[in-house]
C-alpha cells in the first residue's frame, strides 16, 4: 500500500467527544497491528486532536474542505463507524459528483446507498411501516405555518426533530402552540435542509436502548439492553440509566430484542447498531425512536458495562471479519458471537455543571459527563456510583438544606440530580403515591429508592467484600488477562493477585474527555518500564489498557481492599493539579 493510501476513520463532533475518543483508540489499536490507520476529524482542533496529532487529521465540516483533504489520500478506504448524519450529507454530495470513483476511494462497511435508505427520520418511518412496526403520526414541514396545520389534527405534546441537525440539536417537545412555533422556527434554522419532522410524542413512555452487533455474513447477537429511569422526553445522556434492562416482562424484552435484530438485518448494517425504543407502560405497544449505526454514548456505556470494547469489535466487523471467527475479546476459548448474559447491574448517574443546576431537563443535553457503579443489585450499583460523586465532590446541590416546596419543584420540573431530591423527600416521609405523581417515575424505580432509604435507617449489615470480573457470561467462562473488576459487598473474591504491581489511580476530572489520553500514556509509560499496571478508574474507554482494571470509587477504602488482594509495589496518582 502506498504511503498516502490509508484506512481513514471518518469522525465528527459528538457528546463528550465519544466518537473522537473511540476513533483515536481504535486507530491506535489498528496501527499496533500495522493497520496504517488515520482519524479524519471534521471539526475544530481540541485537546484530543492535539494529544493524538500523529494519527489525527483535522478538517472543516465543509464540502470543499473534505474534498481537498480526501484528495491527499487517493486510493484509501473510508470507515464510517464514527461518522454522523452531517458527515453523511457531505459524503452523499461527493458521491453524486463521482468523486469517490475518480479518487479511487472505497467505503468499507455499509455502502452510502445503504445509509441513504434511512438517512432521514421520514425514511426510517417508511422502513418501520414496511416491517409492520407502529410509528407515531407525523409530518415533514418546511415552515411554521405547515407545523400549525399539522398540529390541528393531532394532540399535544408534539415532538420536533430538525432534519440531520448536529448532535440532535434543536430537538424539542412542544406542549402547546406557542412551544411549537418557537421550536419549529429554531429547528428550521439548525437543519441543513431547513426541514423538521413533527410527530406524535411518546412523552412519558419508558425509554430503552438495545445494541446489536452484526457482521456481513448475517451473524449477530444482542450486546446490551439499556434502560433509562427517566421517561421519553429527557435526553438519554441526562437520564439515570442501567444495564441490563431488568424491569421488562419476558414478552416485552423478547419483542424489543426481536425488533432490534430484525431492523439491523433488514437494513443490512454491520458493526455496532443502537436502536432506541419507546415502550408504552400500559400495554405491550412500542415505537422505534431511532436507529443509530454510529458511535454513541449508548455503545460507550455498553462497552464499559460488558468489560470489552464494542467499538473495536464493530470496526473489525466493518472491515469484513466474522463474529464466528473472531475470538471473544474477554472470554477464554469462545468466539465473538457469544451473546452476553450479565449477573450484575451497571448504573450511570449523569453529572451537571453549576450553570445547569436550574435547567429543566428535556430533549437537549445538559450534562457534561457521568459516573458509573456496578453491583449485584440496582441499589448496590447506584450506591457505588453515588460514592464516586461524593469522593469527587461532584454534587454541588444540597437537598437536605431545601424546603419541602423547593424539593417538590425540583422533582416535578425534572431538574438535574432529581433522584437526590426524591431520596430526600422519602427521608422526610413524603407519601409514595405523591412522589409517583410528582416524578412520573415507574413504581419499580421509586421502590428502589425507598429501599435505599430503609437500608440507611436500618442496622448496618455484616458484609464480605469481594471483587468480581466485569464479564458477559455470568461466571460460566474463564476471563482473559486484563479484565476489569468491580466490588460487591457480599461474595467470593475472584480477582487473583498480581505480584509487584504498580497501582495507577485515575483521579482526573471527569468533564474533560481528553484526560483519557493522559491515562493511556501513563499506562504505556509504566509498562515500558516493565511494570505490571493495575488501573483504578471510573472512566469509559479504559478496557484492556492495563494488566488489570478496577472500576471503583477512588478513596482510601478502595485502595486498602486492592492491597489486600494484590502485592502493590507503588501507587501513582493522576490528578488535576499535575
Residue ranges and their predicted role:
Residues 4-5, 104, 110, 193, ...:
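Phosphate-coordination loops involved in phosphoryl transfer and adenosine-cofactor binding
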Residues 5, 16-17, 24-29, 38-40, ...:
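Non-catalytic terminal/interface segments that mediate subunit docking, oligomerization
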Residues 48-55, 106-170:
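A conserved helix-loop-beta module that forms one wall/lid of the active-site cleft
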Residues 453-460, 523, 527:
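Long, charge-rich, low-complexity intrinsically disordered regions
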Residues 35, 102-105, 528-531:
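A short helix->loop->beta-strand "cap" motif at the edges of active sites that frequently abuts
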Residues 515, 522, 530-531, 537-539, ...:
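C-terminal interaction appendages of subunits in large macromolecular complexes
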Residues 63-135:
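Conserved N-proximal alpha/beta basic substrate-recognition cap immediately N-terminal to
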Residues 2-65, 69-74, 97, 131-132, ...:
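ATP-dependent carboxylate activation and anion-phosphoryl transfer catalytic cores
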